[in-house]
């Protein structure tokens, strides 16, 4: 199995578009937090939207909107590199007309959930992650799965509880929200598999759909994390031949 950085994009350890967007999301959140502290008022999705529009510039695309260009990440030449960004993220950001407005599409792809991990370390993680993912993904599954992911990470960070227990608590808090049905169903399913001792492998993961949409990516990532008793075991899962578009795990 893989034990070190693998060659990609002509070098070892090059970051993907997923990582690029996660970094720009974190930059937007930090700027929003500072603005909130300084002024007492801030529309977080709008500030994150500025950051994602700066990422769009690094991909060689001039957005319709005019984002603030004084960010730190945009000054890093290594990030001015086109990877393989998803069409939904590109088109939603290219077509945006108002900062902070949700995307006008019905996509539930994993391009929202894969970038919201930084939301776990800021106030109101579920709401902030959902609103951030909704900037590019308009289907409730696309953005509510992102909210649940950030909420789970936040609870793991704040509470010394097993992952399975944290997932149950997060579902109790948010699983009944309108539009959460697909995500709740799939996450509850992998919880049952874990409780029954069923471990993930490439074939079983493929049966879940492969992780190309948000609820699948989250459920697969949680299943692998639940099954891995150690970092080494998790590494084996990641190198078992499974490939998806998402970096949720």
Give residue ranges: language-model regions:
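Structured, active/binding-site neighborhoods that engage oxygen-rich ligands
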Residues: 1-249
């Amino acid at each position: 199995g893989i034990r070190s950085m693998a060659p990609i994009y002509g070098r070892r350890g090059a970051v993907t578009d997923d990582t690029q967007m996660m970094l720009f999301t974190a930059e937007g959140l930090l700027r929003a937090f500072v603005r909130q502290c300084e002024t007492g008022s801030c529309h977080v999705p709008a500030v994150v939207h500025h950051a994602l529009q700066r990422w769009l510039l690094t991909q060689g695309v001039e957005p319709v909107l005019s984002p603030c260009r004084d960010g730190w990440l945009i000054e890093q030449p290594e990030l001015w590199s086109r990877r393989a960004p998803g069409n939904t993220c590109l088109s939603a950001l290219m077509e945006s007309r108002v900062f902070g407005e949700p995307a006008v599409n019905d996509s539930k792809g994993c391009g929202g959930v894969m970038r919201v991990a930084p939301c776990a370390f800021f106030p109101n993680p579920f709401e902030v992650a959902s609103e951030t993912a909704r900037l590019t993904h308009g289907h409730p599954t696309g953005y509510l799965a992102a909210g649940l992911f950030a909420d789970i990470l936040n609870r793991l960070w704040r509470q010394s509880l097993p992952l399975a227990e944290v997932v149950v608590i997060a579902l109790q808090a948010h699983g009944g929200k309108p539009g959460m049905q697909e995500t709740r169903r799939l996450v509850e399913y992998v919880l049952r598999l874990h409780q029954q001792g069923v471990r993930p492998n490439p074939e079983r993961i493929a049966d879940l759909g492969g992780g190309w949409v948000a609820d699948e990516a989250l459920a697969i990532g949680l299943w692998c994390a639940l099954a891995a008793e150690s970092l080494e075991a998790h590494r084996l899962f990641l190198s078992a031949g499974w490939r998806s578009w998402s970096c949720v795990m």
